[in-house]
Amino acid sequence: MVLPEEPAILEVRHAVRRWIAAHAPDGEIAVALSGGADSLALTAAAAAEARSVCALVVDHRLQPGSADVADEAAARARALGCASAEVLPVDVTGSGGLEAAARQARYRALDSARGTRPVLLGHTLDDQAETVLLGLSRGSGGRSIWGMSAYDTPWGRPLLDVRRALTRQACAELGLSPHEDPHNASPDFVRVRLRTEVLPLLEDVLGGGVAGALARTGEHLREEGAVLDAMAADAQAKAVVEGEIDTALLALSAPPVRRRVLRSWLLAAGARGLGDTQLRAVDDLVARWRGQGQVAIGGGTPDARFVVRRRRGRLNVGLDDRRRV
């Protein structure tokens, strides 16, 4: 399909072209297509810019008629010039709420179907701003407000500098009517309320430009965080001895570096749901040691939880019987 040279679709195409040149020069990509405006504009641009595009349409099967919506999206992808389009039905189950369960099921399906291709996602600057706000609400340190990166293998996000309104304009220029997912308007979901209530209020009170400022903040923190991560990798190589942390060696590092080392070490040991409070308590075992007891962290078994103990100047992760708590 030959795309019209209209302002919005050209901007989306330029964003996709830059991403392909930087991350997929062979031009072999997959696109996650929901049928909504963001992914539809992305798919149209990708089909015009890439050598070969495989459209992947996830059917979450959460609403009546979802199979028809998925089939229509796949047909549109083929009409736009995608080499192939595949519908991926999934079962949405698991803990953490419907939003999280659907996301996990979607990413598993996309990863399984992509082969060796990177998968382009339709996240926009507005999505980035919402992600940074969600991270701020958790208060889990700088990493939680990094936002999303343009390429986190295998996930590509070419539209992080493009506003959501522009993808809608691009669809209008193409004569395409995007699918409107009812879940995207439901106040039951935190991200929807951020989009429809919080961000518009911030834009109004602060005089505009909030979404862009949030996205830039996330990008700056991500760049600085990459430097700290490199420093932490070096510190970890020195401080981890036989799977344990040498507290004297780790104490030589600055607090942000120490916490990165501890986070990496704990996750490798099997910690789950690691929060800032737990991480700082473990850091206290290194830098503010006063003989305090063990620190409980997430993970373990049904009968025993993971704990961190300090013994003879080293930290180790062990199990503690939950039934004694």
UniProtKB/Swiss-Prot annotation:
InterPro entries in alphabetical order: Rossmann-like_a/b/a_fold (IPR014729), TilS/TtcA_N (IPR011063), tRNA_Ile_lys_synt (IPR012094), tRNA_Ile_lys_synt_N (IPR012795), tRNA_Ile_lys_synt_subst-bd (IPR015262)
**One Pfam family cited in the UniProt record for this chain:** TilS
Protein name as it appears in the record: tRNA(Ile)-lysidine synthase
Disulfide bond sites: none
State where ATP binds. 34-39
User: EC class of this enzyme?
Assistant: ligase
Q: What Gene Ontology cellular-component terms does the record carry?
A: cytoplasm
One GO term under biological process is: tRNA modification
Sorted keywords for this record are:
ATP-binding, Cytoplasm, Ligase, Nucleotide-binding, tRNA processing
Q: What is known of its domains?
A: The N-terminal region contains the highly conserved SGGXDS motif, predicted to be a P-loop motif involved in ATP binding.
Reactions accelerated catalytically: cytidine(34) in tRNA(Ile2) + L-lysine + ATP = lysidine(34) in tRNA(Ile2) + AMP + diphosphate + H(+)
What's one GO MF term for it? ATP binding
- Provide the protein's localization: Cytoplasm
Q: Does the keyword tRNA processing apply?
A: yes
What Gene3D superfamilies does this protein map onto?
Answer: 1.20.59.20, HUPs
Per the record, the similarity remark reads:
Belongs to the tRNA(Ile)-lysidine synthase family.
Protein's job: Ligates lysine onto the cytidine present at position 34 of the AUA codon-specific tRNA(Ile) that contains the anticodon CAU, in an ATP-dependent manner. Cytidine is converted to lysidine, thus changing the amino acid specificity of the tRNA from methionine to isoleucine.
Q: What is its EC number?
A: 6.3.4.19
- Keyword Nucleotidyltransferase among record annotations: no
